[in-house]
Amino acid sequence: MAARGGAERAAGAGDGRRGQRRHLRPGRVLAALRGPAAPGAGGARAALAAALLWATWALLLAAPAAGRPATTPPAPPPEEAASPAPPASPSPPGPDGDDAASPDNSTDVRAALRLAQAAGENSRFFVCPPPSGATVVRLAPARPCPEYGLGRNYTEGIGVIYKENIAPYTFKAYIYKNVIVTTTWAGSTYAAITNQYTDRVPVGMGEITDLVDKKWRCLSKAEYLRSGRKVVAFDRDDDPWEAPLKPARLSAPGVRGWHTTDDVYTALGSAGLYRTGTSVNCIVEEVEARSVYPYDSFALSTGDIIYMSPFYGLREGAHREHTSYSPERFQQIEGYYKRDMATGRRLKEPVSRNFLRTQHVTVAWDWVPKRKNVCSLAKWREADEMLRDESRGNFRFTARSLSATFVSDSHTFALQNVPLSDCVIEEAEAAVERVYRERYNGTHVLSGSLETYLARGGFVVAFRPMLSNELAKLYLQELARSNGTLEGLFAAAAPKPGPRRARRAAPSAPGGPGAANGPAGDGDAGGRVTTVSSAEFAALQFTYDHIQDHVNTMFSRLATSWCLLQNKERALWAEAAKLNPSAAASAALDRRAAARMLGDAMAVTYCHELGEGRVFIENSMRAPGGVCYSRPPVSFAFGNESEPVEGQLGEDNELLPGRELVEPCTANHKRYFRFGADYVYYENYAYVRRVPLAELEVISTFVDLNLTVLEDREFLPLEVYTRAELADTGLLDYSEIQRRNQLHELRFYDIDRVVKTDGNMAIMRGLANFFQGLGAVGQAVGTVVLGAAGAALSTVSGIASFIANPFGALATGLLVLAGLVAAFLAYRYISRLRSNPMKALYPITTRALKDDARGATAPGEEEEEFDAAKLEQAREMIKYMSLVSAVERQEHKAKKSNKGGPLLATRLTQLALRRRAPPEYQQLPMADVGGA
């Protein structure tokens, strides 16, 4: 029976160990494993040193044995061979040089040697029965190596990438005029400005169309409304006239303006009086206007915000655009010829001109259609070489010129759902045609129509596929054979549109770009595409796809090369099986087996692990007959009760049942054999010691290969800060401040209401116009009449104003009360005067006369008789005295006023004489005269 490993029963002198042939050189194998320092791999110097070393050891070992005859070691007795214990080893010489030793020492040495030569508890040994041919195997033939593909359908084409258009719509607008009112106070030797304010007022639309754009002139008068009343201002407080417009002193790029005057009029009055002067400067300024989506208002570069869409008009459905003003404030003129502001000449091309008059400014701009001038998407990049491939149900558009990859769904995107997106198809088709003419006109043909896809991050990819001329010829040949059409071929390969809806914009802050929607006629009811502010994720996606493609291609090539290498190694395995079939079978089957070749097939038997058997290694490798064992002899048993079996230690702890592996004995014999978990060392075919694994250096033939295929990863856009957060980082929001300030009057006041004046002013204005039409004389007469009427109106207005004042009303009430009291007192006085004039006129005199009369009459005397004549005379005297008093008062008043005095006295005298009865004179007695 052939032993495992290929060792023969009787080897020749030149044979080596088991499994070794003349053409196998261990030095070269070790040199390949360990490098130049391995044994057998050195040069001539290393070989000479090794030869000298072996010669020295041979002389040292041959010297003691030179005096002894060469004897053959006796064969072991049969009874010892049956014992499971190893044969006795020669005892070491005693101290006196004899070979004998004491019985106790011999017993201890034998016990120690027996323990050292026994296998450990964790040792594993295998017993392999000889292959009988019951199981026959063969090597598998070479395999065909597959060519790995990435599994993607690439389509070459031209792409145009669009993003969200966040740029505002800009256009030119024109605004008008300034009014400056200055109040001064004049002193004796100086003048001071006590107040000055500037007000911006609008210009009438008729003045703009008839004067500014026709004659390049402007009136020096301004009419406007303030606090519900109409105000008229004149430049330099003079009559209005048509002033020419002249360029402004300071001009800058994009900022142009024209005006009528440079002076600010300041009026100076008399000393100690205030005087107000007015300046009207007609300013025509060209400004830049900006409007953002949804275009419901626009802002001027002056800070004014107009709450009307710049596309508001009266035709083509533009009246549905947003406006916050009454229709009377807006006017649109078709076929309007405007004037060039730089040269002052009238332009030849007519335009549609919009005019809007607000409270402080008149704005004019050219009306244009909305859909043709604004677009919610803007062209970002053109990719003249774009590849579209399908991966995991998605499309990937790779633009190497941009180093970016965009991922989208496999369905096309309907741009009809995006408001104001008509520009995308037109611009993209024009860009694709231009790129094709410049680069691919002679090498490729366009296939199919323009397709649009919504990529992640809010990018719209317009892709036009194309084919190379060679591939197009193949398609045409295929169509000729199948009688098909080119449209049908491309339609079968093109992606089918699906129910794709536009991605709606993220909720924004109130008043933000996405807070309002425009009219339904422009498609604003659909969703607007919102693009992220950074495209780094597309660059990362391109980088990852590039690395993934490169690594997967490398792995596929490595797998193919591995397959080819396995096919080539199959031939080596076939040859190795002929040299050592058991080792080849064990390596191929991945378990311990014994095998032998049966021609081109192999007989295999599986080895069995020795359970709890005991294995002992013997201390000598010398065999009877002058030969030596090539493998150490062992004895093993299955369990405690089984008979021991003599055998040899095979390779890798294999137990061979017989002892048939022998070789000629050689000098300087040194061998290491694997025994259980350790190694045993033999020198000159005698057991020396057990060698742990740590004392032997390990050389490995394994090459580690740890490969992991990269998984598919898609980078998603991540916004760290939203637009609302970025806009809210500043301390103040200037646009919001302006919006709130200018919305104040619109929110809380009615700027369109006009307070009507009274009829007196209308009458005065009519009289003034009447007298002005009569010439110079009429104007002079009108001035006098209007002055008098104005004085009367002023007096009445002053009285009304005084009464309207709370203090004036109180004073008026007190005056009325005082008048009533005075009237009551006057009424009492008149009543007393009528009843007793003498007492009323001369109360003191009458009282004194009465007292004298009472005192003159003595008590007890009789009163004299009453004289009726005297009483009548007294009455006449009192009457004339009152008349004289009245005449004197009238004359005094007449003298004081220097008119009407004598006339009034004469009339009173005549009146008194007319009513006087003819006098009856009686001559008085002389006694009375003398007594007087």
UniProtKB/Swiss-Prot annotation:
Designated gene of the protein: gB
Biased composition (Pro residues): 71-95
Coiled-coil regions, chain positions: none
Keyword Disulfide bond: yes
InterPro entries: Glycoprot_B_PH1, Glycoprot_B_PH2, Glycoprot_B_PH2_sf, Glycoprotein_B_ecto_C, Herpes_Glycoprot_B
Signal peptide: 1-62
Chain positions carrying an annotated carbohydrate: 105, 153, 441, 483, 640, 706
Annotated family: Belongs to the herpesviridae glycoprotein B family.
Posttranslational modification: A proteolytic cleavage by host furin generates two subunits that remain linked by disulfide bonds.
Segments of this protein annotated with the region Disordered: 1-25, 67-105, 492-527
Membrane topology listed for this record: Single-pass type I membrane protein
UniProt entry tagged with the keyword Transmembrane helix: yes
Main subcellular location of this protein, as a coarse class: virion
Subunit structure: Homotrimer; disulfide-linked. Binds to heparan sulfate proteoglycans. Interacts with gH/gL heterodimer.
HAMAP family: HSV_GB
PANTHER family listed in its UniProt record: LP07818P1 (PTHR48125), OS12G0136300 PROTEIN (PTHR48125:SF10)
Protein name as it appears in the record: Envelope glycoprotein B
Transmembrane segments: 807-827
Protein task: Envelope glycoprotein that forms spikes at the surface of virion envelope. Essential for the initial attachment to heparan sulfate moieties of the host cell surface proteoglycans. Involved in fusion of viral and cellular membranes leading to virus entry into the host cell. Following initial binding to its host receptors, membrane fusion is mediated by the fusion machinery composed at least of gB and the heterodimer gH/gL. May be involved in the fusion between the virion envelope and the outer nuclear membrane during virion egress.
Gly residues composition-biased segments: 511-526
Intravirion face of the membrane: 828-932
Location relative to the cell: Virion membrane; Host cell membrane; Host endosome membrane; Host Golgi apparatus membrane
Ranges annotated as biased composition (Low complexity): 1-12
Biological process (GO), any one: symbiont entry into host cell
